[in-house]
A protein has these predicted regions:
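N-terminal Rossmann NAD(P)H-binding glycine-rich loop of SDR-like oxidoreductase domains
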Residues: 4-24
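NAD(P)H-binding glycine-rich loop region in Rossmannoid oxidoreductase-like domains
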Residues: 49-92
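NAD(P)-cofactor binding segment of oxidoreductase domains
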Residues: 65-67, 84-113
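Catalytic helix-loop patch of NAD(P)-dependent Rossmann-fold dehydrogenases
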Residues: 91, 126-165
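Conserved Rossmann-fold NAD(P)-dependent oxidoreductase catalytic core, especially the SDR/UDP-sugar
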Residues: 99-143
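Flexible, glycine-rich beta-alpha linker
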Residues: 122, 145, 162-187
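Alpha-helical substrate-binding/gating segment
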Residues: 177-193, 199-226
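C-terminal substrate-binding subdomain of Rossmann-fold SDR/epimerase-dehydratase oxidoreductases
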Residues: 207-269
Length: 269
């Protein structure tokens, strides 16, 4: 049975990832401050991910218990801009990522998937995107401390994979994560389309995001790869043509947008 450490396994996306991985035969160990649901089937290790000593000890402890972990899924972070002061967002998120990835590499892990973010694309798009649908081809445009850290993580992954050609690091630029209970709010978005223009009306169901994590883990890719992860539609019932005409009339449109197709290109994924 393949063994994976999941950081942030008690969060919205993390819970779905743990469930998905356990269901598909992975042996899951969760590193987090908060325990995942007791019925998750995962082993829980309470930990402060900003403390490298704790992280390394836990990772090597997993190695001692299980021979070694086979993979790492890193989801733990301050989850969005504005939750805490900027300096805390920066210090927490960059140190957690470095600590977890560094400890995993020390334990011999070469299969790493981590949560990047759609915010790297220039959200909240106060400066309009260069074209729509947005994709992975244009350089990152971080507009917040949160997205700046995600940009640095992507750059770090590229260099770590250059150092070790056997290392795989896949960054998933998740859109706004939704759970089933969140769908009740979708009809209200039509009354105020401006409230969702910040991410081009995109979203990702936590269960679909979890599937993306599993498929990334199980892929035979090497090196670093970045993917936008969003659902195939928008949160709106208004057609894309109307939304673009109202909010982004001067932005280049590439291809057929469809009536409700996502404006966060998932073609690469």
């Amino acid at each position: 049975m393949a063994r994976v450490v999941v950081t942030g396994g008690a969060g919205k996306l993390g819970r779905a990832c743990v469930e998905e991985l356990v269901r598909h035969g992975w042996d899951v160990v969760v590193f987090d401050r908060v325990s995942p649901p007791s019925e998750s089937g995962a082993v829980f290790v309470p930990i402060d991910l900003t403390d490298y000593g704790q992280v390394l000890d836990a990772m090597l402890g997993v190695e001692e218990r299980y021979v070694r972990p086979d993979a790492l899924v890193h989801l733990a972070a301050v989850p969005a801009p504005g939750r805490v002061p900027d300096h805390l967002t920066f210090m927490n998120n960059i140190s957690c990522t470095w600590n977890v990835v560094s400890a995993a590499r020390r334990a011999g892990v070469t299969n790493i998937v981590w949560a990047s973010s759609e915010t790297v694309l220039g959200l909240p798009f106060e400066t309009p995107p260069p074209y729509i649908p947005v994709d992975e081809e244009y350089p990152p445009r971080p507009e917040s401390t949160y997205s700046l850290v995600k940009t640095l993580e992507e750059a770090m992954a590229a260099q770590l994979c250059r150092w070790n050609p056997e290392l795989k690091m896949i960054g998933l630029r998740f859109s706004n994560v939704m759970e089933p209970a969140d769908y009740a709010r979708f009809p209200s978005f039509d009354d105020d389309a401006a409230s969702r223009k910040w991410n081009l009306w995109g979203y990702i169901d936590a269960r679909d995001g979890a599937q993306a994590v599993r498929l990334a883990l199980e892929s035979d890719l090497t090196g670093t790869e970045i993917f936008i992860i969003a659902n195939a539609d928008t949160v709106m019932s208004r057609p894309n043509a109307d939304l673009i005409k109202e909010f982004y009339p001067d932005v280049e449109v590439r291809g057929d947008l469809g009536e409700h197709d996502t404006l966060l290109s998932i073609e690469k994924a």
